[in-house]
């Protein structure tokens, strides 16, 4: 059951719904296309109040939202072409339009040579590519992904993530994905919402969520810290705007300040490699160190 969920998904982004099993991720995802209802509150999708839709209006609304699942849901007795063409046939598109769209989508997902193959002859990654092509046939503006990579091996997972990124960048499709894999979120998503027990733990920009986690997020991510008891411990965060600047060495030289490095980490977020660092300085030098950090553009906090 979901409770007190309030978030906004920016158009044209890749947005992650993240949490452990039973957190409510898939339930929240399915409210976006009306597969799951809700008792209180409101949900607006692309300017439409979902609660106001029913019958044919809801059916037409769902044309604008594609969806892919963990287990592909392909028809075993139909070849790849017919699996992708299914939504178009249901909506009675002309045959010429069906041919054009299906072959364009098979080219997009890298399966143009597999149009006559049947699902039993495909790998797991290829089956998911067919499912993605099928989800895009009606040219949706939103693509929902419910644990679409969790049944795949690491190499297949990466290929599907690359494909979702291509779809987002080239077609401008908003991708909302459910996952429990933190590496997927870091590599692919622009924003994310973390759920726990049906409640929203935190949401926002990926860099801020992972590089500057609050105590609840640190507990969720399983991070623990062992810090020196003497001196002052300061955590520094290096967003991409200042990630290449030699801030630490500049501080040491300009302030003639000796400090020790407690720990640090580097992580890849999309195309950027960003990090955080914890340093320990003498308590007597805290004030001047803080003044320097304030002017440096780096984010920081005293632990």
From Swiss-Prot:
The keyword Phosphoprotein does not apply. It is a peripheral membrane protein. This is Methionine import ATP-binding protein MetN. It is an enzyme of class 7 (translocase). Belongs to the ABC transporter superfamily. Methionine importer (TC 3.A.1.24) family. It catalyses: L-methionine(out) + ATP + H2O = L-methionine(in) + ADP + phosphate + H(+); D-methionine(out) + ATP + H2O = D-methionine(in) + ADP + phosphate + H(+). It is found in: Cell inner membrane. Its EC number is 7.4.2.11. Part of the ABC transporter complex MetNIQ involved in methionine import. Responsible for energy coupling to the transport system. The complex is composed of two ATP-binding proteins (MetN), two transmembrane proteins (MetI) and a solute-binding protein (MetQ). SMART domains: AAA, NIL. One of its GO terms (cellular component) is plasma membrane. GO terms for molecular function: ABC-type D-methionine transporter activity; ATP binding; ATP hydrolysis activity. It holds the Pfam family NIL. InterPro entries: AAA+_ATPase, ABC_transporter-like_ATP-bd, ABC_transporter-like_CS, ACT-like_dom_sf, MetN_ABC_transporter-like, NIL_domain, P-loop_NTPase. Keywords: Amino-acid transport, ATP-binding, Cell inner membrane, Cell membrane, Membrane, Nucleotide-binding, Translocase, Transport. Residues 1-222 form the ABC transporter domain. Signal peptide: none annotated. The keyword Transport applies. ATP binds at residues 19-26.
């Amino acid at each position: 059951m979901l409770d007190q969920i309030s978030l906004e998904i920016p158009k044209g982004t890749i947005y992650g719904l993240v949490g452990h099993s039973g957190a409510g991720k898939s339930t929240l995802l399915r409210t976006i296309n009306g597969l799951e209802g809700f008792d209180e509150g409101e949900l607006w999708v692309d300017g439409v109040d979902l609660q106001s839709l029913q019958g044919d209006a809801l059916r037409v609304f769902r044309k604008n939202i594609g969806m892919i699942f963990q287990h592909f849901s392909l028809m075993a007795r139909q070849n790849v072409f017919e699996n992708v063409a299914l939504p178009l046939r249901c909506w009675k598109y002309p045959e010429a339009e069906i041919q054009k769209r299906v072959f364009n989508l098979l080219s997009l997902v890298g399966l143009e040579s597999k149009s006559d193959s049947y699902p039993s002859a495909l790998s797991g990654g290829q089956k998911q590519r067919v499912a993605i092509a099928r989800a895009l046939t009606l040219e949706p503006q939103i693509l929902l992904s419910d644990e679409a990579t969790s049944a795949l091996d690491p190499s297949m997972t990466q290929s599907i993530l690359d494909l979702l990124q291509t779809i987002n960048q080239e077609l401008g499709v908003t991708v909302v994905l459910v996952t429990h894999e933190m590496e997927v979120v870091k590599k692919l998503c622009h924003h994310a919402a973390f759920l726990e027990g049906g409640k929203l733990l935190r949401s926002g920009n990926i860099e801020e969520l992972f590089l500057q986690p609050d105590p609840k997020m640190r507990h969720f991510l399983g991070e623990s810290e062992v810090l020196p008891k003497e001196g002052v411990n300061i955590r520094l965060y290096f967003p991409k705007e200042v990630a290449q600047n030699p801030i630490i060495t500049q501080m040491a030289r300009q302030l003639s300040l000796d400090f020790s490095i407690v720990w640090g980490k580097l992580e890849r977020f999309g195309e950027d490699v960003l990090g955080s660092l914890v340093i320990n300085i003498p308590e007597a030098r805290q004030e001047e160190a803080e003044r320097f950090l304030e002017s440096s553009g780096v984010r920081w906090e005293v632990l």
